Amino acid sequence: MAVERTLSIIKPDAVAKNVIGQIYARFEAAGLKVVAARMAHLSRVEAENFYAIHRERPFFKDLVEFMISGPVMIQVLEGENAIARNRELMGATDPRKAEKGTIRADFAESIDANAVHGSDAPETAVVEIACFFPSLEIHSR
């Protein structure tokens, strides 16, 4: 199994609910290590650049508005198959379809306010991590 890194964002809805610690506990219980982390209030430009892949999608404007609506917690997770493991923890994008016990089933409000973001592939993870963390700020442990 490969040790990977993935980007995770705890979105404004989950930050506002004060469940950061509960989400971190799930990461750690699944064998994922937080190797970089910071809280930020994204600017419109940062959110638009981060989600640029969705620029032509009908939900893009609402997604950007949501992501700049409050602080987010951004972290790099590291571990065996970190990308797939994190995606399992998150659950389906639509919390109504997410399996019981997943982050989205337990903490998300809607398909828009869905608590967390996670990289979907190794190539995406590299690009997403670089958006928020220079390599000097990431510390394997």
Curated annotation (Swiss-Prot):
Keyword Metal-binding tagged: yes
Name of the protein: Nucleoside diphosphate kinase
Binding site for ATP: 11, 59, 87, 93, 104, 114
Alphabetized SMART domains for the sequence: NDK (SM00562)
Source species, domain of life: Bacteria
Xref: CDD domains: NDPk_I
Subunit details: Homotetramer.
Catalytic activity: a 2'-deoxyribonucleoside 5'-diphosphate + ATP = a 2'-deoxyribonucleoside 5'-triphosphate + ADP; a ribonucleoside 5'-diphosphate + ATP = a ribonucleoside 5'-triphosphate + ADP
InterPro entries assigned: NDK-like_dom, NDK-like_dom_sf, Nucleoside_diP_kinase, Nucleoside_diP_kinase_AS
GO biological process: CTP biosynthetic process; GTP biosynthetic process; UTP biosynthetic process
EC number: 2.7.4.6
Cofactor(s) the record lists: Mg(2+)
Protein keywords: ATP-binding, Cytoplasm, Kinase, Magnesium, Metal-binding, Nucleotide metabolism, Nucleotide-binding, Phosphoprotein, Transferase
Function: Major role in the synthesis of nucleoside triphosphates other than ATP. The ATP gamma phosphate is transferred to the NDP beta phosphate via a ping-pong mechanism, using a phosphorylated active-site intermediate.
Enzyme class: transferase
Catalytic site: 117
